[in-house]
């Protein structure tokens, strides 16, 4: 496998990251100014974006140069730039999972940015696994989750075209879980679920969790987010508890599970 080498860090250099894109506030300017004032009083490196502020961190993602290139090459909006820590969680999980047998799966691939960042980080067109991306790509009124900016006719074809040079990436349009009946892998080493609603996420877990191989990784994008996403945690916690698992909450808002 042609995997990215570890970039030796400079002991004396750490990189700050301040990108004021966040959600759930009324006065964005006030929050930005408060965060900037905090960063002027703390030790480096600080990181402010995506609803969290921390300092005294290595900000390792910015020292991993192959990741930085994959991330920057695939950013297509401010939100993608802001969630760099979330993207690096995916990249590191994928680096682990690519050493296992099993395909990669993302439920809720939307514009394909998460998939393509991971694939480009781990070899690009030489990515050594099959990657399945599922999405309805359209918003139907009455759905449990909110519409996304680019939902609508033509989005599925646009995302399929994005991966035209990647024969190992399968973009599948359809409603979860019914879509799995026609096209889905038998064995999974990496499962990323980002459906923005509890009902569909539990349906995806019902269908796919038993296919995840031992040591495979499940990442729940919205697990530790409250606000509009709190129902996902409240629904998924008992689901995992029945199976003897506890989701690891991450400060990025994600949740992580390692399959036994």
Label the model's feature ranges.
Residues 1-87, 93, 98-100:
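Rossmann-like AdoMet
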Residues 52, 56, 60-81, 99-260:
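S-adenosylmethionine/decaboxylated-SAM
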